[in-house]
Every structure is written in structure tokens, then in C-alpha cells.
């Protein structure tokens, strides 16, 4: 397999990253004060806040003095997030929302605007995965995957962006995936939906630039995360392609959002794959997929298919 020699420099670089995945979000005192001033008193709406990354992000924003608006289809999980935030002394309000239904998104957004007011930071985090190959995936599940992972972004953003434009400040965060930058067997609907999420963010950022408005965007593309959504998946080289801890991913996301980064891939090694995907022929990329175990990473998928998280 001659193409594997192309991997040797990257393998050498990656071998120097021992302990990288234990990184925590730390900033200097000066920057920390600026961040607190930026977030304190701001209203942050997070979709998929009933578990996983959404819940952890809610805690982190709450620690910085933000007011939280929690959206999730999982009412019980969302109530648990709300309870923990209130125990921390954080002002928060929870709403049960099915993000696959745009009319429900619009209805709940109107309720938020009347009960809470303007949203300053919108975190489009909710997502679902079926983990089924195209011919085995029921039509209704494919439709729901695209509805939650892609279509919902249009309607959440359309509802809360006008307030940001009026005040000439705000931030829209899209939690996408490395599946939005490549294709993976067993994730046809998920990859398509996340490519849509990446395209949504890129086009939105372009529109905001054209308007000369100071509303920021951040798109986040992590690999597999150990939140339950991808239970059962495995890669051949976990040092290079680890199953990431949600705590680590949230640390990276918070740093990116609070420092206004436009694009974040997690882990850093992912940037190499993004570059290679744009340079190498499909035959070579397939060899990489085999070598790293990506091609068959979904073969033993179990997952958690009943929630938006």
C-alpha cells in the first residue's frame, strides 16, 4: 500500500500530541475579564440542551453569567439541566420543542421573544443520527434527520437573527461534524445533513459580511463524541482518531465561540484530513478510510436514536 507512506509525517506529528485531548479552556486574567464582560447578562439559547454537549455548554455559559434558554424535545432531560443551572444560581428557562417541526420552532420562538426577550447567542446544537446504510434506513428517519440537523437551522436563525441585526451584535453557533466535510459509510443521511449545516453556516457568514453587520458565526466540526449518539462505533487508530470526551469538545467550543473563531475542527489532526480530502483522488481517500478504520467504523453502531441531542 504505497499511499500509506503519505501518512508518516502526520503520524509523527500526532505522536507529539500526547495529552492534547485532556486540554481545558484556560485564558489569561485579562482575557478572562473581557470574556466575562462579553457574556455576562447575555441571553444564550441552546438547542439540544437536555443532555450531552448542549447541557455542558449551558453550564459553561452559566458560569460566565449568561441567561440560558433551553430547547429540547426531551422534556425530562431539559428539566434536569434547568434544575442544575438553578442550583448554580443561573437564570434559565426551559422549553420543550420538536425541532423537526418548523411551525413548532416558530411558535416557541415567539414565546421566547415575549417571555425572555432578545437572544444574543444562538447555539444550534441539537442533532440526531440513525446510523443505518441508505437502503436500510426508513424514509421517515431520513426525513427527520435532515429536518433536525439541517432544516431547523433555517428556522431558529430566521427567528432570532433579526434581533441581532437590529442591535448590530450577536453570535450564531452551528454544531456540525467532520461528517459535514467528508463521507462515511453508514451515515449517508447524517453526512448529507451535516454537509447542509456547514453550507448553511458558510452562506450565512457570507450574507452577514455583505450586510457589514457585527454578528459573528462559528461552525464546529468534531469527529465522534462519546455522548451516547455514537455508541458502538470504533476506529482503528484511536490515538489519531479518538472517541472524544464531551467535556473536551465543550472546552474547545467555548474557546472558539468566546474568541470569535469562524471555524473549528476537533481534534487538530482533522485539519490535515480536510486538506487531504481536497487534494487527493477518491481512490487514495478510500485507502485512508480503510487504513484508519473509518470505512467500517459504523459496523457495530448502537447509538441513541430516540432523542435530539
Swiss-Prot record:
Q: Phenotype upon knockout?
A: Viable, but intestinal cells contain lipid droplets that are reduced in size and that contained a reduced amount of triglycerides as compared to wild-type.
Give this protein's Gene Ontology molecular function annotations. Answer: alcohol dehydrogenase (NAD+) activity; oxidoreductase activity, acting on the CH-OH group of donors, NAD or NADP as acceptor
**Keyword annotations:** Lipid droplet, NAD, Oxidoreductase
What are the record's GO terms for cellular component? lipid droplet
Q: Where is this region: Required for lipid droplet localization?
A: 1-50
By its UniProt entry, which Pfam families does this protein fall under?
adh_short
Superkingdom of this protein's organism: Eukaryota
Chief localization class?
Answer: other
Instruction: Please give the catalytic activity noted in the UniProt record.
Output: a primary alcohol + NAD(+) = an aldehyde + NADH + H(+); a secondary alcohol + NAD(+) = a ketone + NADH + H(+)
Q: In what tissue types does this protein appear?
A: Expressed in the intestine and vulva.
Q: Which InterPro entries match?
A: NAD(P)-bd_dom_sf (IPR036291), Sc_DH/Rdtase_CS (IPR020904), SDR_fam (IPR002347)
Role = May play a role in lipid droplet formation. May modulate triglyceride levels.
* Entry protein name: Protein dhs-3
| Species this protein is from | Caenorhabditis elegans
- Point out the gene that encodes the protein: dhs-3
